[in-house]
Design a protein with these regions (language model features):
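Hydrophobic/aromatic ligand-binding patch that stacks against planar heteroaromatic rings
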Residues: 113, 149, 178
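Conserved thiamine diphosphate
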Residues: 144-171
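Active-site proximal loops enriched in glycine and acidic residues that flank catalytic Cys/His/Asp
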Residues: 93-94, 125-128, 161-164, 172, ...
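Conserved internal helical-beta-strand scaffold that buttresses enzyme catalytic cores
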Residues: 1-90, 96-137, 153, 157
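Amphipathic alpha-helical segments in well-structured domains
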Residues: 104-107, 143, 172
C-alpha cells in the first residue's frame, strides 16, 4: 500500500475506495486481495518523466516474476531497445519466498539466455525473516542467507541494513550502476 501511494502516486482516496464493500473492478476479477492489483503512473524525476508499472501480483508468491520479465522483454523489443537501458525490471521479494519458491530459481536461470534475457534485473529482498509456514527462521532454509540460491548465476549480493536509509540509497544506486554497466542481475538483501 505504501508503494502504491508514496512511490507510484495512487491517491489514498482511490486506494481505500477499493476496500469498500460495493466497489466493483472494471473487467474480469480474480477475487484476489485488492492490494495485489497493479497500477502504473508517470513519475517526474530530475532527469525527466519516467513511466513506472507495478504488475498485478497474485497471492501465489513469486509467480509474477517471469511475467514481469516477459513484459519487460516485450517492451524492450517494442521500443527497439537493443542496449536494454530503457525498461528495467525491479523485483521485490520476501526472504522466505526468494529461497523457497522454485519459480525464483527458474527465473534466475533464464536471466542470461538470449531468448529471455532483459539485460539484468534488480532484486530487492525484504529480509524480515517471516515465512508463512515457518515459525523459526532456522527452519526456513539450509543456507545462511536467503540470497545464497542466487549464487548459481554469480550475481552480486549487497547486504544492507534497512534501518540505515543512507546505506539503502547507496546500495540502490550501486545496484542501478552495476545493472547498467554489466547487464546482469544484482540483489539487494535488506
Amino acid at each position: 500500500l505504501n508503494l502504491l501511494v508514496n512511490v507510484l502516486g495512487k491517491s489514498p482516496k482511490e486506494l481505500f475506495s477499493e476496500f469498500e464493500e460495493d466497489y466493483e473492478l472494471e473487467g474480469a476479477s480474480t477475487g484476489d486481495v485488492k492490494y495485489h492489483l497493479g497500477f502504473s503512473s508517470n513519475i517526474i524525476t530530475p532527469n525527466g518523466e519516467v513511466h513506472v508499472s507495478l504488475n498485478n501480483n497474485p497471492s501465489h508468491l513469486e509467480i509474477v516474476n517471469p511475467v514481469i520479465e516477459g513484459s519487460v522483454r516485450a517492451r524492450q523489443e517494442r521500443l527497439k531497445d537493443k542496449n536494454k537501458d530503457l525498461v528495467i525490471p525491479i523485483l521485490i521479494h520476501g526472504d522466505a519466498a526468494f529461497s523457497g519458491k522454485g519459480v525464483v530459481m527458474e527465473t534466475l536461470q533464464m536471466s542470461q539466455t538470449r531468448g529471455y534475457g532483459v539485460g539484468g534485473s534488480i532484486h530487492v529482498i525484504e529480509n524480515n525473516q517471516i515465512g508463512f509456514t515457518t515459525s523459526d527462521p532456522r527452519d526456513s532454509r539450509s543456507t545462511l542467507y536467503s540470497t545464497d540460491v542466487a549464487k548459481m548465476i554469480e550475481c552480486p549480493i549487497l547486504h544492507v541494513n534497512g534501518d540505515d536509509p543512507e546505506m539503502v540509497v547507496f546500495a540502490a544506486k550501486l545496484a542501478c550502476e552495476y545493472r547498467y554497466t554489466f547487464k546482469k542481475d544484482i540483489i539487494i538483501d535488506m
